Each structure stands twice: as structure tokens, then as C-alpha cells.
Amino acid sequence: MFIGVGTDIVQIPRIEKILHLYPELFAKKILTSKELAQFSLLDKTGHAVFLAKRFAAKEAVSKAFGVGIGQGINLKDITILNDNLGKPIVEVSSNYTKKLPPFNIHLSLSDDYPVCVAFAVIESSCNVISR
């Protein structure tokens, strides 16, 4: 069963400006510990794109759930990782998912400076969704 679809676009220069003002604070505010571990391995030149893609992805996933960030789900409730081939994998905090039936999240990320885009589709095998 289809639950929802969400998309988000982020201007990479906007993230670059934020990083210039708050180099460590912004990453710690939006990334989970697993994402911060990946982030710390990157060269600084890749920081803005990494953060822009993660922010867009989290917004897209929250929109697909039909709630939006801060409206029942927070940035740190969503973790975006990659499998061995680079495919995005989404993990959602059990604090949020305990109210939901089993679901799958499909996520696509792309960037072409100065923008990045995220597209998320959420599906469930159950017929009823309670929030």
C-alpha cells in the first residue's frame, strides 16, 4: 500500500553559507551519530554537498510521511546511509515508527551544483495506517 511521496530541493550555496558561519554546529544539529561518522571522513570540500543532500532527504522523507520536519518527526529521527553500491538507505527512529505498520522507504538523491534534490516514496504492506 502506498503511504506517501515527498520531494525537496536544497540550494548548496545556502548550506555553504551556514557552514561558514557555524562549521561544526550545523552538522551536529541535523546529522545522527551514524551520519556524523561518515561526515567526519569527508574532505571539507564535500561537506556542503553531503549536508545539503542529507537535509533534502530528511525533508523528503518527512513529507512522504505526511508530517514534515518538526511536526511529529525531527531531523535526528531520520538517518540516511548508503549501501555498498551507494544506494541511499533510510533508517527511522523507533520513537517515530512504533506507531506505524511495517514500511519501506525508497529514496533517490541527486546533485548538480548549485542544487541537490531528494525524492522519497514510502510504501506499506498493511492497509491501515494510524498516526
From Swiss-Prot:
The keyword rRNA processing is annotated on this UniProt entry: no
GO CC annotation terms, alphabetical: cytoplasm
EC number per UniProt: 2.7.8.7
Catalytic activity: apo-[ACP] + CoA = holo-[ACP] + adenosine 3',5'-bisphosphate + H(+)
Listed GO MF terms: holo-[acyl-carrier-protein] synthase activity; magnesium ion binding
Protein's cellular compartments: Cytoplasm
Family: Belongs to the P-Pant transferase superfamily. AcpS family.
The keyword Metal-binding is assigned to this record: yes
A Gene Ontology BP annotation from the UniProt entry: fatty acid biosynthetic process
UniProt binding sites for Mg(2+): 8, 59
Gene: acpS
Superkingdom in the source lineage: Bacteria
Record protein name field: Holo-[acyl-carrier-protein] synthase
Cofactor: Mg(2+)
InterPro entries registered for this protein in UniProt: 4-PPantetheinyl_Trfase_dom, 4-PPantetheinyl_Trfase_dom_sf, ACPS, Ppantetheine-prot_Trfase_dom
Task performed by this protein: Transfers the 4'-phosphopantetheine moiety from coenzyme A to a Ser of acyl-carrier-protein.
Keyword vocabulary terms for this entry: Cytoplasm, Fatty acid biosynthesis, Fatty acid metabolism, Lipid biosynthesis, Lipid metabolism, Magnesium, Metal-binding, Transferase
Pfam family, one: ACPS
